C-alpha cells in the first residue's frame, strides 16, 4: 500500500508539481513580506513618536505587540499618553489600550480602536478642566501622508460615550453617537512646526469638515464646515449646523441653574423665531451658522464659548 501511494505521488504531472512549488514559494514570500511590514509598522510608530517629541509633545506608551498574520497588521499599544505644554495652556490625554490595524497591501490606511476610559486634562492660567470619558466604542480611520506621517483624511465613529461629570451642566452625561469626516486640503504639511503650518495656510490649506453628527442628551447636531488658520496660526472656522432638541436643551440648562427662568423664556422665544417653525421627521429644526474668530465660538452673533490656544512648535 505504501509503495502504491509513493508511486501515485511520483506520477503527478509536472505542471501540478510546478503549481505546488509556486504556491509554497508565494506563501513563503508573503510570510517574509508580512514580517518585514510588521517590523516597519513598529519602527514607523517609533519614528512618529520621535518626530512628535521633537515638536514638543510628550509621547509615551507601554508594551507594543504586533499580530494579525496573514490578512492584517495589528499593533496593540498599552497605556498611551500624549501631552503638550505651553505658556497659555497645557493639555494631557491618557487612553486605554489602543489597537491600530492596516491591511498589508494598504498600509497608508489605518484603523484605530480605543474603547474604554480616556482622561483629558486641559490646564490654563485660569483653571484646570478634566474630562473623564468612557467610550463604549471609538473607531478612527486615517489616511496618511507618506512624506510627513500626518493624516490627510479622518473618520471618527463613537457610540455610548459617558462622562463622569457633564461636559455642559444640564445637558446630560451621555453622548449616544458621534461621527466626523474631515479632510486636509492643499499640499500636505511635512510637520506641525509653526513655519510649515504658516506656509500651508498661505498656500490655501484648510481642513474640510465633510460631515459632523452628534447626539448628546436632548440634542442632535449635524452639519459641515471649513477650518483654517488666521494670521496668528489660530483656528478660524465657519460651519452650517442643524440643531434639534434645542427647546429641551434650554429646559435642561435652566434646571441646572446655568440660566435663569426669565432668560430661558427669552431664549425659547428667540429660538422659535429663528427656527421659523421648520420641522422634519425628527422634530423642530434650527439652522444656524457657527463660527470661530479670535479664539471665540459664535452661534450666529451670540458668544457660546472659547477654543484652546494652539501652541505650534517653533521652526520647521
Can you say where each PLM-predicted feature lies in the sequence?
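Extended terminal
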Residues: 2-21, 62-63, 198-202, 206, ...
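N-terminal beta-strand/beta-hairpin edge segment
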Residues: 54-166, 212
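Hydrophobic residues embedded in beta-strands of well-ordered beta-sheets
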Residues: 73, 110, 235, 296-297
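Short, surface-exposed coil-to-beta transition loops
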Residues: 93-95, 220-224, 285
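Small-residue helix/turn framework positions
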Residues: 110-120, 134-275
Amino acid at each position: 500500500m505504501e509503495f502504491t501511494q509513493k508511486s501515485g505521488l511520483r506520477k503527478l504531472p509536472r505542471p501540478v508539481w510546478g503549481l505546488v512549488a509556486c504556491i509554497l514559494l508565494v506563501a513563503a514570500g508573503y510570510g517574509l513580506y508580512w514580517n518585514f511590514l510588521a517590523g516597519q509598522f513598529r519602527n514607523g510608530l517609533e519614528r512618529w513618536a520621535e518626530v512628535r517629541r521633537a515638536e514638543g509633545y510628550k509621547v509615551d506608551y507601554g508594551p507594543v505587540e504586533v499580530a494579525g498574520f496573514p490578512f492584517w497588521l495589528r499593533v496593540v499599544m498599552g497605556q498611551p499618553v500624549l501631552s503638550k505644554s505651553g505658556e497659555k495652556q497645557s493639555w494631557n490625554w491618557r487612553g486605554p489600550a489602543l489597537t491600530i490595524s492596516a491591511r498589508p497591501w494598504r498600509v497608508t490606511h489605518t484603523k484605530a480602536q480605543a474603547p474604554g476610559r480616556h482622561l483629558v486634562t486641559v490646564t490654563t492660567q485660569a483653571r484646570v478642566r478634566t474630562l473623564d470619558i468612557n467610550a463604549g466604542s471609538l473607531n478612527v480611520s486615517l489616511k496618511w501622508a507618506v512624506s510627513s506621517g500626518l493624516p490627510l483624511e479622518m473618520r471618527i465613529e463613537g457610540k455610548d460615550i459617558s462622562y463622569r461629570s457633564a461636559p455642559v451642566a444640564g445637558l446630560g452625561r451621555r453622548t449616544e453617537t458621534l461621527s466626523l469626516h474631515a479632510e486636509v486640503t492643499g499640499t500636505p504639511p511635512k510637520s506641525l512646526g509653526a513655519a510649515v503650518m504658516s506656509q500651508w495656510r498661505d498656500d490655501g490649506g484648510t481642513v474640510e469638515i465633510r460631515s459632523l453628527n452628534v447626539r448628546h442628551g436632548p440634542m442632535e447636531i449635524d452639519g459641515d464646515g471649513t477650518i483654517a488658520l488666521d494670521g496668528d496660526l489660530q483656528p478660524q472656522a465657519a460651519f452650517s449646523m442643524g440643531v434639534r432638541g434645542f427647546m429641551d436643551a434650554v429646559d435642561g440648562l435652566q434646571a441646572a441653574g446655568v440660566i435663569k427662568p426669565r432668560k430661558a423664556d427669552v431664549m425659547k422665544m428667540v429660538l422659535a423665531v429663528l427656527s421659523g417653525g421648520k420641522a422634519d421627521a425628527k422634530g423642530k429644526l434650527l439652522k444656524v451658522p457657527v463660527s470661530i474668530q479670535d479664539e471665540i465660538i459664535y452661534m450666529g452673533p451670540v458668544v457660546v464659548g472659547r477654543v484652546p490656544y494652539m501652541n505650534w512648535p517653533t521652526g520647521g
